[in-house]
Amino acid sequence: MSLKGSKTEENLKEAFAGESPANRRYLYFAQKADIEGYNDVAAVFRSTAEGETGHAHGHLEYLEEVGDPGTGMPIGETKANLASAVQGETHEYTDMYPGMAKTAREEGFEEIADWFETLAKAEKSHAGKFQKTLESIS
């Protein structure tokens, strides 16, 4: 039985999409708790973030047979993972962040538009690093 095209594939992608930002949010919340002096609370957030990472990795293990949920490219072997990373980062710096910056600027959010443009530059750098690394092992 193939996972490709199934409702279960959709569910795994949805679950992965939920777990990944939860990890980042909890790490951010931990940082805030540290600043406010709640070290024990920060530890709870960090521990839970690590659990969310484990959940996301579990979803990816099942999704390996159908491809990267972000790019649709094959995942599993390092060369394929690097190629997928290049594609994902390239999308972010060529389409995603420029489009978001344009929208933010049109809506009058200049500082946020500048932030998105800064991120586009960072993503371009990431894509270049991944591409260089891929070429070095090919």
Predicted feature locations:
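Non-heme di-metal
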Residues: 1-138
